[in-house]
Every structure is written in C-alpha cells, then in structure tokens.
Amino acid sequence: MSRPDESNPLLAEQIAYYRAIAPEYEDHAIPGPGEGELIAAIEAFQPTGDVLELACGPGVWTERLLHHATSVTAVDAAPEMLARAKARVGEDRVRFVQADLFAWTPDRRYDVVFFSSWISHVPLDRFGAFWSFVADCLRPAGRVFFIDDAYRTPDELIEGESSSAIRRRLNDGTAYRAVKVPYRPADLEDRLRRLGWQVTATATSGPCYWGQGMLGRSRGEGGG
C-alpha cells in the first residue's frame, strides 16, 4: 500500500472525497444516455490477457473486464471503494491494491491498462507524467482503454470555468475539492499524439467519451 501524496492538498482532498462518497457513489451518477455505447466499445476492444484497472472505484467496470481478461489488478486509493468492489466482484482472478496512483509503482507489466472517470481527475501539470506511468505499466504492444466525461455543473466551478478545481458535495452537504479537467475527445487525441500515443477518442450520445489505442514507436514532445 502506497501513502497518499500529502504534498498536494487538492489531491489529498480528492482522495478524501472518494473515501467519503463511497457509500453513496451510485447516487451521484451522471445523467444522460450512452452507457450502452461504452459497453459495446469495451466488448469490441476485448481487454484480454492481464489487465490493470486504475481507480477501480466500486468495481462497476471490473465485472465487465472479467468477461475477457485472464486476470485483473484493480487499484484504488480509497479503501472504502475497494471494499465495495470486493463485495461486488468476489472473483479470484482479481487482485485488489490500495494505492495512491501518483505514488504507486506496479510490480509487473500488463497487456491492457484500463481506467474510467480518472483522466479528468489528473491535474494538467501531471498529464505527461501520468501517461509515462501508463506506458511503464504496459508490455510491448500493450493497449489502453479509458472512459471519462467533461461534466461539470455551474455550482461546482468555485474558481471559474477556466480552472480545473471544482467543489463537490455529499448528500449531507459536506463539500470537498477535487480536480476535474473537461477534456474533449479531439483535445485528448492531440495531447496524446504529442506524447507519442496512437489513441482514438470517441464521444457517446451522452456526456461520456471513450478512448483506445497504444503507444507509438517513439514518444514525442509536449503534453500537460
């Protein structure tokens, strides 16, 4: 288990938020269509082999990954989320790891790295470092698949539309700050291309998008 990065108060508060929201996580689902499109995209992608799931949360997508994967390593910083994921999945092909993703080093490489509702929570100044980390997690010819959204409500924008810092509340009104970068698919494709990735990002008919691809032969410059 890695220790959270306490040097960044915003990221520490983001972890605290996801620990606190775990019991009511499903109450805060983003409204709108598109879930069927995401499921169809994952089924077409076929995440086979050994899969690393980053920020697994309550295990919603872990179940789906097991339709194809030989094994899944599911990582999350919030023990409360991992407890819910373990109760949901109950599968001996899954290894659960509690770790801060900004401080964790994997002990092996994987055929696929998957993450949902995570890239938007990575600060812009850590974007390039995060994707270097993803590359280090993959075996040669390894693939990546991710799901996210750009959904932010006006009352969350405590520092204005241009800031990636937001405020979210629990059902009892308790407020926490978190990171939420409202990427658009074309923007993500461009940023990743400059880092040497070959990724296609696709919008659904709802608020979400998905991306899939792999690292190119050489990494470019830019990002973040």
Predicted regions and their residues:
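Conserved class I S-adenosyl-L-methionine
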Residues: 1-46, 49-57
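Class I SAM-dependent methyltransferase SAM/SAH-binding core
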Residues: 57-103
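A conserved beta-strand element that flanks and buttresses the S-adenosyl-L-methionine
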Residues: 114
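Short catalytic micro-motifs in class I SAM-dependent methyltransferases
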Residues: 117-118
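A short glycine-rich, Lys/Arg-flanked "PGG" loop and its adjoining helix->strand segment in the class I
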Residues: 128-140
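C-terminal alpha-helical "lid/dimerization" subdomain adjacent to the S-adenosyl-L-methionine
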Residues: 147-194
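Conserved Class I S-adenosyl-L-methionine
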Residues: 182-215
